[in-house]
Amino acid sequence: MKKILALVLALSMLCGLMVTAHADDKIKIGVSIWSSTDTLGSECKRLIDAAAAALDVDVQWVDQAHISEQVTASAETLAMADCDGIIICNSASAEMGSVIKTCDENEVYVAQFFRVIDPDLNPDEYAQAKASKYYVGAVHESEFDNGKKLVTILGEKGCKKIGLEGWEPGDATFQGRWEGYKAGVEEWNAAHADAPIELLEPQYGRTTTDTGRATAEAIIDANPDIDALIVAGGGGDTLLGAIAGIEAKGLTGKIAVVSTDFLPDLDAKLQSGAMAAESGGHYADPFFAFLLVYNAIKGNYETSEDGFYNMVFPYMFVDSPESYAAYAQYFTGSELPYNADEIKALAELSYDDLAAACAALSVEDVVARHAK
């Protein structure tokens, strides 16, 4: 009997040590992103690295170029690297079936950023996400409203024929923006029968400057009468290529360019006429996905096998150097929308309070907190 009690005691102590060791382990979160070095990706990395430092979290990055095979492989890579959680910017929602399966099998929490699974377009993946204990949720923008707003800005600037450059056919974010562009055109034309807008079918410029430029030039060559070009996104390099192509044709300022994903020199681009307007400031989106996964790992946010968290992040719009100035002062360079103390405080919030903080983020919000 004494031997049995001694064995039970030893096992209890061993289990206690194992639990303690696990509790003391540093949290590790993987980030699967199209690129951590382009305009938007590097800004995302800057804020996530700051959050990781403030919360004492290890981060591992994988750049997957929005190539489907690399997106799904990135989840496997990060799971094998002993990540406790993953945040991912996938390309097509179909990829999430494999990603969620990998995370379920490895008991790794996962959240999407800049993306959400549409229940109508991808019902199987949506059902899989709802049923997964390890799929935490998604942080994303209202791409539909973003698209409508940009088209409205072009209409107000007098544009009549708009070219459209996407980056990857079937990309969920592009599809949402495209629906918004089309709805914006329809709404504008219904209210301005004497000044209708025509939106061309999309051409795809991938995510490099070379392909972005070649695609923009091809659109212009096929439609020399366009007076506007929407470069839907793609991380920034696609837009830089398109701007270079327009400049090479001597059409800077003659073709109004709008896009999503703020460039680091947007003020100069607005001043020169290379850009007419841009939506952006959303590089903090993955920061909130990071906090979702962080809290799921710590057990603060319960995950469900019949639903997930869905957080909407606000876009900011600028159409002049003046409107960009405040953003540049408080969001770029060495500045971040949240400092270390604020990051720690956000990490302690309930989900509802965190979602409210996310929805409230704006230039005015940051100025109020950080203005000296």
Regions found by a protein language model. Name each.
Residues H22-K372:
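A residue-level marker of the well-folded mature domains of exported/periplasmic proteins
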Residues M1, L17-A23:
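Intrinsically disordered, low-complexity Ser/Thr/Pro-rich tracts
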Residues M1-V8:
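Positively charged n-region of N-terminal signal peptides that target proteins for export
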